[in-house]
Design a protein with these regions (language model features):
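Conserved helicase ATPase core of P-loop NTP-dependent helicases/translocases
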Residues: 54-60, 65-102
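Conserved nucleotide-binding/hydrolysis micro-motifs of P-loop NTPases
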Residues: 9-11, 25-28, 51-54, 75-77, ...
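A short helix-turn-beta junction within AAA+ P-loop NTPase domains corresponding to the substrate/partner-engaging
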Residues: 1-7
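Conserved interdomain hinge at the start of the Helicase C-terminal
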Residues: 12-63
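Conserved segment of the helicase C-terminal RecA-like domain
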Residues: 94, 121, 129-167
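A short beta-strand element within the Helicase C-terminal
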Residues: 103-118, 140-144
Length: 189
């Protein structure tokens, strides 16, 4: 029996790195803020389990003057499309979302995935992480955990713990802005 293997050994190396971040508080907002500041302005998707949580996280980050946008099923379609467009074109580097963004969106070069809430099942974990490390790219997935939270069996226990600096500097504003010009009611400019 002959076996053909066209993949070079280095191609088999994992392209997705898993890390955990321990939050000293059950409310993980400050830990998320520090992690986002530490990561800088790299394309980052933050997953929450509920629409209300998405809105709460976005409100907190915007109050801290951290630019971000949200994406969930309770939003009007034009608002969702606008948020995705800004995320894709780089004028918004951080998108806070429910699992609605975990499937079917082809967003190239997402560098980081942050699980603000633990995914509800293995399928959600797989699809969330599938937004990064696509094709030949690498990516990093972070799980923010409170000390009392236990990892579900489908998430590997062996992962590096990332220690965050006390007060990381907020990254500078994006160099890009998105300008929307509507066509009006009669679709004329």
């Amino acid at each position: 029996l002959m076996k053909l293997d066209f993949l070079a050994p280095e191609a088999l190396a994992p392209r997705l790195r898993l890390h955990k971040v321990i939050s000293p508080e059950k409310d993980k907002l400050e830990t998320l803020y520090n992690l986002l500041c530490t990561l800088g302005y790299h394309s980052t998707l933050v997953f929450c389990n509920y629409r209300e949580s998405v809105e709460r996280v976005v409100g907190y980050l915007k109050a801290r003057k951290f630019p971000c946008d949200m994406f969930h099923g309770g939003m009007e379609q034009p608002d969702r499309e606008r948020a995705l467009y800004k995320f894709r074109n780089g004028s918004c580097h951080v998108l806070i979302s429910t699992d609605l963004a975990a499937r079917g969106l082809d967003i190239p070069e997402v560098g980081h995935i942050i699980h603000y809430h633990l995914p509800v099942n293995e399928e959600a974990f797989t699809h969330r992480n599938g937004r990064t490390a696509r094709w030949d790219a690498t990516g990093t997935s972070y799980l923010i955990l409170h000390a009392e939270e236990k990892l579900p069996s489908y998430i590997p226990e062996e992962m590096e713990t990332v220690a965050l600096p006390e007060n990381p500097p907020r990254p500078p504003k994006s160099l890009w802005a998105t300008i929307y010009i509507g066509k009006g009611k009669k679709e004329k400019l």
